[in-house]
Amino acid sequence: MLWFNRNFEVPHRLRAIVRARESSVIVLAALAGAMAGLVVAGMGAAVAFMHLQLFGIEPGARLSGQLTLNPLAALLVPSLGGLLLGLATTTIARWRGSEVDPVEANALHGGRMSMRGSLIVAAQTVWSSGVGASVGLEAGYTQLASGIASKIGQAFRLRRGDMRMLVGCGAAGAIAGAFGAPLGGAFYGFELIIGSYAVASLAPVGMAALLGYLTAQLFTPDRLGIDTGTLSTLALHDILIAGGLGLIAAGFGILLMRGVAACELLFAKARVRPVIRPMLGGILVGLLALVSPQVMSSGHGALHLTGIFKLPIAAIATIFALKALASIVSLGSGFRGGLFFASLLLGALGGQMFATGMNALWPSLALNPDAYAIIGMSALSVAVIGGPLTMTFIALETTGDLWLTTAVLIAVILSMQVTREFFGYSFTTWRFHLRGETIRGAADVGWIRDLTVAQMMRADVRTTPVEADVAAFRQAFPLGSTNQVIAVDEDGRYAGMVLVAEAHAAELPSVTPLREILHHAAHVVLPQMTAQEAIAAFGKFEAEALAVVDSVERRQVLGLLSEAHTLRRFSDASERQRRELLGEM
């Protein structure tokens, strides 16, 4: 398609219309949502075809919904598939482009994503799930759908705020299509990809979610939502008990996310070559699948397996433990995908076990295991991905039960708060943290990083030799000519700063060397520093202005930056960002 070409731009007249009319952005959002629905249908069909060919399951069946698997296929397909993935990843490493996640794109890059990188991530996700690795397709769905939306925005040269919103529209359409939940998809876009709610974004994101849902349903014959069975009415005490389940889900979610990082560290410490790590992970997943086929792929099919929640609690606990281990090993060994789908199955199984255990201890409670499967599913997913309203609306659209949704809301709020308090990350931002990024969500902080000292400094600085005396300085820089003058040595290196008013003080002898009245000789800022870092430096050094040097070692003067100018530029940028967020620009 034309917008896959990074050099493609639509004609100027059409771009002008889109930038001038809000309704035009809604049209682009609808297009992004429809494309997201096609992405969901296409990737789902590709994975289903791989399962059909590689594992020999019946057409229309789901891999994780199988009661038994061919032992040879269960062992060989994930291991050989992992080996091929490792070889392919190593081969394409030089030209795959930047793989920018939608959250990272909106937080740091103003919504700009690489189409090539998004296609590769989507292909790796399809392959990983297709060969049976315990990974979720949602990562590939949102990556490719958001990448297409970003490319549409780049073709129309949308403003930064509109670009970020359109990326959120792509993700919203993908999640709405994947779960059959347009409201849940819309709030996924708001909470996790855009990072905020705004009236101006409601129509575009809502339209994208609706089109994503309708398109996916049109091209996918079976329902992609979650089957829950029949739910009975909840009692008042269920609301309170749901909060306890939310706390437990938060703790397990933290362990699950840390487990993936620990698995990666274990492979690294064992000095296992990255090219063969997926193969080793595939072998272990295959062994686990011999015990329970529900551990394979995303686990979406297991949620459709009507009898899974009717199994004895020991069997449910076994599936729960094996699925958690398979997910940790799959992601930790290098398979591509997400943890969202796995957390749905794990949370549902955990909720069932929780309700069954409580009923065994206190039969008078008469908890409904099916209802607690929904509560546990929502609470664990929020601990892993964030987005409390996303999961609340998915639960509502799945069950149509407002009373149950109230219990879900209590559970997800507590789960989210405990996870934020004791861990501080979702699975996505935890991965960013492990590679050195400091972002905690999709809120736009890229403008802060873009506003650097190099952009704000004055390059036309006035300097004076540090060997001069006060008399020579007074003659060269009369009172009122400037506020500060930078002193440099014979090699042009920064030596300190002279305050003009202080140098002209009557009580200061004219023969005084400038070296005796230098300020901030050891205090400088660097051109790559952000405005926030510069403001912190002014406060730390108690300076009204600081010299800008090329490096701490060379100390060649590049310019001068004042605190007042920095604060003004930062305030202007903040106000511009606020207006974009509210749709005033």
Regions found by a protein language model. Name each.
Residues M1-D450, A454, A459-D460, T464-A476, ...:
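Alpha-helical transmembrane segments and immediately membrane-proximal extracytoplasmic
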Residues T438, I448-R462, A468, G496-L499, ...:
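Bateman (tandem CBS) regulatory domains
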